[in-house]
Structure formats: structure tokens, C-alpha cells
A protein has these predicted regions:
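FIC/Doc superfamily catalytic core
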Residues: 1-130, 134-196
Length: 196
């Protein structure tokens, strides 16, 4: 059988998706509290309490990180934790503006691009000490559910290319590399499903 942690992680993720879908159907506006609530569901059984010089925070409650984080061991550092709250507020405001436009003028391609950009930006902010990848994919799918789109996924064998695309977007300070990767990935997955 699978390790217990993985089972708990998947159970938590399913509950987070259930909540996300309800909020997507209600067209609930994005807010820092909403993101923290979803993160608390994602990390419910695998998160933990951290005691740092900056104070205590609990990843199982969706608390934003109060420490620096890097991509893997010895990887590049994500933004300073002090910048996270304001960047997350800006993120919510920007996403809400684009959501409002889409509600008035629905456009599937623009909705997909919004979902990919939200994913990309959330990874770059890295608001939590753990679960950022799961949250970024959840938020991408959340926006796709909200606008009635077929949800996109990244298949296991494309994981390296997915990480490369995220890195390219960050290095070039452009949404394009990740948008192109995700559009290609989504098209490929849809074609494969049609063939099956």
C-alpha cells in the first residue's frame, strides 16, 4: 500500500477541491483569507507548527510562511517572507480584475491564460512553507471550474518540462513560456483522451 502520508495528502487535496468547486460555482472573489482557507484544507493532516525567530506559524491552518524557502536543497530562494502578504493581496486584486472582465465577456482562451498565470504567479510568491505546488494547481483548476472549462493537468512524464517552463517564465519575467507549455500540454492531453 501507499505510505500513510501520501494517503492523507490525497484525502486533504480531495476535500480542498470539493470546497474550491463550491466557491468557483458561487463566483466567490479571491482574497488572502480564501487562499489561506484552501491551503489549510490542503495541509490539514500533513502540515505542522513551526517556531521561528519571527514567531510561530502553523502550515496545517493555512498560515503564511515566516521563513525563507528555496527550490529544493541548495536551489534558488523564493521571495522574502516579509513581502508575501502584500504580494498575495496584489495577486488577489489582479485575479479578481481579470475574473470580472471574463464574467462580463466570456472567452475560453483568456480564461485558460488567466488560470495558467494564476498558477505561475502563486508558485513565484510561494506563500506557504509547504504545499505551494498543490495550491497552485488547485487555483489553476479552480479558475477553470469557475469558467466552465475542461480542467488541465500535468502528466507525470512532463513534470521536468513543466518545472523548466515555470523557471523560464521566472527568468524571462514573462508569462509566455508557461502559457505556451500549459496550452500545449492541455491540447496534448485532450487529444490523448479523445483517442482513448
Amino acid at each position: 500500500g501507499r505510505p500513510m502520508v501520501e494517503q492523507l495528502m490525497n484525502l486533504d487535496l480531495k476535500r480542498a477541491y470539493d470546497q474550491s468547486i463550491l466557491w468557483a460555482e458561487e463566483h466567490k472573489a479571491f482574497s488572502v483569507d480564501m487562499l489561506k482557507s484552501l491551503s489549510a484544507l490542503v495541509m490539514k493532516n500533513t502540515g505542522s507548527l513551526y517556531s521561528t525567530l519571527q514567531g510561530d506559524f502553523d502550515s496545517s491552518k493555512g498560515d503564511l510562511r515566516l521563513v525563507g524557502v528555496t527550490a529544493g536543497s541548495g536551489g534558488r530562494s523564493y521571495m522574502n517572507y516579509l513581502k508575501v502578504p502584500s504580494r498575495l493581496t496584489d495577486f488577489c486584486n489582479a485575479i479578481n480584475q481579470r475574473r470580472e472582465i471574463l464574467m462580463q465577456h466570456p472567452n475560453d482562451i483568456d480564461a485558460y491564460l488567466l488560470s495558467f498565470d494564476a498558477h505561475n504567479i502563486l508558485v513565484a510568491i510561494h506563500p506557504w512553507v509547504d504545499g505551494n505546488g498543490r495550491m497552485s494547481r488547485l487555483i489553476m483548476n479552480h479558475l477553470q471550474f469557475e469558467f466552465g472549462l475542461v480542467p488541465s493537468k500535468v502528466i507525470t512524464e512532463d513534470k521536468a518540462a513543466y518545472i523548466e517552463a515555470l523557471n523560464a517564465s521566472r527568468e524571462e519575467e514573462s508569462m509566455l513560456p508557461f502559457q505556451c507549455f500549459m496550452l500545449n500540454e492541455h491540447t496534448k492531453n485532450l487529444r490523448a483522451e479523445i483517442v482513448e
